[in-house]
Amino acid sequence: MNNLDSSLQAHNKLEKEATNLALLKDRVDKYHDLSTQMSSILTIFEKRLGNLEQTILPVYQETEQLQKRQQNLEATLNCLESVLSHYDVSQEVCQLIHQGPVEGNISVFLDALAKLRDANDYFRHNNSQSVELENVTSLFNTGCEGLSQHYSMLLKKHSAPLKPVELLDLIYIEDDSSDEYTSFRQLSQTTREELYTISHWLEQNLREYTNIYATERGEVVLRSLQLLKDHQKSNSWGHEALRPRHSGRQTEPKKTTSARLQQIFEKKANKLYLRATQTIEQSTGFSIKKASSHSDHLTSEDLMDGDQELDKYLVMLLGLQRLLNWERAIMIDIIPQSKHNEVFATLAYNAIDLVVKDAEAITQRILRCISRKEWTSALGIFSALKRVILLQPDIDRTYDPAQREQLKKVLKKLQHTGAKALEHFLDVVKGESSTNIVGQSNVPKDATVHELTSNTIWFIEHLYDHFDVIGSILAQDVLYSTQLDTILMKKALPVEERNKALLAIYIKKALAELNLSIMNKCEQYNDQATKHLFRLNNIHYILKSLQRSNLIDLVTLAEPECEHSYMEMIRELKASYQKTWSKMLVGIYSLDELPKPVAGKVKDKDRSVLKERFSNFNKDFEEACKIQRGISIPDVILREGIKRDNVEHILPIYNRFYEIYSGVHFSKNPDKYVKYRQHEINAMLSKLFDDSA
């Protein structure tokens, strides 16, 4: 049964496979027929395409040739139109060119110039003998001239010198944003854009415009400075009003011009110090403590010893810097960068020249003042020099090398004037001129401190406020630099201390000449005591002034024994003064030479000796007291010390003489000779140096 089932299954599978094989064979036959048919179709299609290509290709080639002809025709027409436009451009733009450009619509005029330039290029290359070339060239040149005139007109129309008050705002309000002062920006943005467009067109077409711009804007700077200068002459100096910065804001208290200047230069000095500090900290990692700098010496005394003309000049110098910074900012918006240096140099030249010439005039005037012994002008020079030095970083940033060299003349003029002032002051102290520092040749009758001494001390005290600039001036003198080298061989000094040492050398020379002058002047007195007291007054005043102002520490850099020398000189003068009493005391000092009284009596021949001794003492003492009551010793301690020394020196000698001989009967009229008791001598000595006694 199982075998039967297996056979049946095998039979069924065989039949099924036979059926599938027949079906596959049938399909293969059909595929072969289809392939044969497709091959026939493709062969026919290929033949037909070949026939079509043979038909279409000539048409295509003909069409391509027609297209080329059309393109050539269009190009020819365009060329003809272009050529015709070149011939017509003269008539087309003639009226526009002669009318000139219109502000705010410059592009139309520039388009017309572009057409003329193209026509000019065409005729120049294709028909150089054509009359049309002359026409377009003439019109183009006329247009360029009109454009240049329009450029100049725009600059003139929108450029006006700053009013003095506006310029003073720019000077005094250094750190404020310029956006607050849009009224200063006379050239609006649209005007700047138009000027920029014209500048670049003229630059590309090799036309001159830099001189026009530099001349017009340079005139603005120059006129602004001249108006400021006139304003300073006409206005009450030191109280110029500033414009209100913001409406509705409470007005600030008025400051004097000098105070504003001080504030500006203090800011500059602080900026320099901060920049130096940051540099050192970044390079070394160490922080530094603020040392004395320019700003430390820009005190109110600077303003007192300053010269108004110099302060006005500093305002001019600051004004020039602000104006030129302003011009640089404007120039960036108008002039191509490649022309900046050239334009700025021309623009700034006249203004810088004005400032330099003003410096020459001021320094000449100050030299005349110094020749008249007006020493505040000399101190003003040093103050101005200090401030000009503070301006150097701004000058380096603002000006090109040639302009910096031009402005160096200001610095050199001030340095030269300062050197002349120092030199002339020494000459005056030496007494080489016909008059002394106060213009008088007489010494004071009361032998008080001579005005030469007080003025010399006043001057050198004020010099200390400017030791930095004075040191730089003196360093250029080989005599001072040599002495400084000698000091440095003994002791190393930092740069700031070197400037102080140079000033100390100068003060040492001034004091030496002053001492010599005082010594010579004391010879004008006939009385020896007055001579010594005159010198003592002056030497004591010098020493106390040096000690009070701490200048003694400065002078010690150049002369370590200065204080000791003056103290020794005072001691010697006091001793010399005490010796002037010797003539009066010589007759009563040596008791051994006098007759010895016995029971209150002396021999008849000795009476005349005692009369003579008492009489001579009385006469000399009264004469000395009379003279010295008219002498003034201003210093209380010195005056009382000398009185005390006189009492200690004279009274004991007189007392001994008085006690022995006052009771001796050597005259019928003893009161005629024994005129003074001990307390009366003491009272008279206490009234010395007091003319009212």
Swiss-Prot record:
Keywords: Exocytosis, Phosphoprotein, Protein transport, Transport. The modification Phosphoserine is found at S236. InterPro entries: Cullin_repeat-like_dom_sf (IPR016159), Exo70 (IPR004140), Exo70_C (IPR046364). Residues 236-259 are annotated as: Disordered. SUPFAM superfamilies: Cullin repeat-like. It comes from the Eukaryota. Required for exocytosis. Thought to function in intracellular vesicle targeting and docking before SNARE complex formation. This is Exocyst complex component 7. It comes from Drosophila melanogaster (Fruit fly). The gene is Exo70.
